[in-house]
A protein has these predicted regions:
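N-terminal G-site of the GST-like fold
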Residues: 56-58
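Structured beta-strand-rich core segments of catalytic domains in phosphoester-bond hydrolases
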Residues: 5, 9-34, 50-54, 75-139
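Active-site beta-strand/loop signature of hydrolases that rely on acidic residues for catalysis
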Residues: 39-46, 60-84, 118
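Enzyme catalytic cores with a strong preference for nitrogen-chemistry domains
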Residues: 2-5, 41
Length: 139
């Protein structure tokens, strides 16, 4: 019983994650070569897809960022039970963009929340770094 209580306690803690490297982004086959003279770059805190009206609507977020060639997103939810995909993956599918979800912490041993990058162009290498060590809900 004590061991089960220990596992539940550890699982419910928020854990920060280490950096990683990679060579491709999810759905990179959908990217296109940059041929223009202008590039639209955006950043958006999606607040887990909750708008100022309190409604959660990820498709509304997709409409807002649809004109960006590259967009960085903050407060992106990780995979949900049942779907197995994070919000960045869904946005990438709908907008036909390569997507990378970078969880900043785990909860119940799974990626919980983090940042994301969506890109219309091929990415040959990526790296995410933990900017500072952090624990707890304050980060």
């Amino acid at each position: 019983m004590l061991a089960l209580g220990g596992v539940i306690f550890l699982a419910s803690r928020v854990w920060s994650l280490r950096g990683r490297r990679g060579t491709v982004l999810a759905a990179s086959d959908r990217t296109q070569t940059f041929n223009g003279s202008a590039l639209t770059v955006g950043t958006y805190n999606i607040h887990r897809a909750r708008g100022t009206d309190g409604r959660r609507d990820l498709r509304r977020i997709a409409r807002i960022i649809s004109g960006c060639d590259i967009v960085a997103l903050q407060e992106v939810e990780g995979p949900r039970l049942g779907s197995g995909h994070n919000q960045a993956w869904h946005l990438g599918q709908w907008l036909r963009l390569a997507a990378h979800f970078a969880p900043s912490r785990k909860l119940f041993f799974f990626p919980h929340r983090g940042n994301a990058l969506l890109c219309r162009f091929p990415v040959s290498r990526w790296q995410r770094l933990a900017l500072f060590p952090s624990t707890g809900r304050a980060h």
